Amino acid sequence: LHVQARTGSYAVAGAVVACTSIGEAVAMPMTARLLGRIGMMPTLVSAALINGVSMLALAFIHVPATFLMVLGFLIGASVPPLLPAVRALYPQMVPGQGLRALFALDTTAQELIWVIGPVAATFLASAISTAIPLLFSAAVTIVGTVWFLLSARQFRPTIVSSTVAFGKVLANRAVILAMAASLALVASFTALEVGVLALYGNHNLSAGIALAATGVGSLLGGVLFGHRHLGVRGLSLSMATVAAGTVLFGLVDGYGVQLAALFASGLGFAPSLAAIYVMVSNQIAAHSTAEAFGWLNSGALVGGAIGTAIGGVVVDAYSPFAVIMVSAALAMTAAITPLIARTAGPVG
């Protein structure tokens, strides 16, 4: 919104957003690995400061489009690796079966962020200024990072320095499965977003409520099922629920029934991610967990970009219904990945 308002170009705005995603996807595994190498304090504080300053620069500095893209890349590359840090520390905080409940809470909180964040940013941009969400984001990044570090002191957490080569964790079958499944699942979600927005056209409120229905379904699914041991079949069934609800949404008429279908599709989203995170946490050595979760974050970002790109192309070439079916196909692809992986042996 901010870049489009400044430049008058949606193409430039999209390019800046793409550069931000690329920057985060490329850098996150590396910054996550630094957590064990140089420590949480210097890694997180330096990243938060660079990220905050970069967002302030994007908010106030008038520069050509090329420099805006560079700023976007820097913003993405400097995102503090808080998610990998927190998820690597969970086993130290809650042992045993409590870990599932904690990851379920994690994915539920993530759903709240995905629902509230875009709405809040859009409201602030339209009500006050497009620069305000960037200022708010910079403040949240810096204050939130400091708050996390101060809160973590009472647990005396430690992230072990990795003793293996960078990227070697990608050879682990649990990480491969987790990246493939989460990439396809997130791609399904972002493609569905494109389909919903295209289906309801200029009815922004209807589209917003429809997307919120998916988020609420995922939120409830995380609370009710995220703490349970799913197993391979359960994980596949959870992701198949996302696919089935998406297909139903594309086939039914009537706004109320469509909302119900989207709600049903969301029920499997958070439990699936929670199960994936628990699997990685259990199967990866302590010195590699932060890097592994950094790669998972990158995979999710790539999946989101793929889903959005495919959705846009399919909408232009065919119809909103076609995008919704593509979204369902991506979710079904995610659902079969655990079954395929199991044929090669247990993966956790």
Task: Pin down the residues of each PLM region.
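C-terminal transmembrane helical hairpin of 12-TM major facilitator-type secondary transporters
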Residues: 234-276
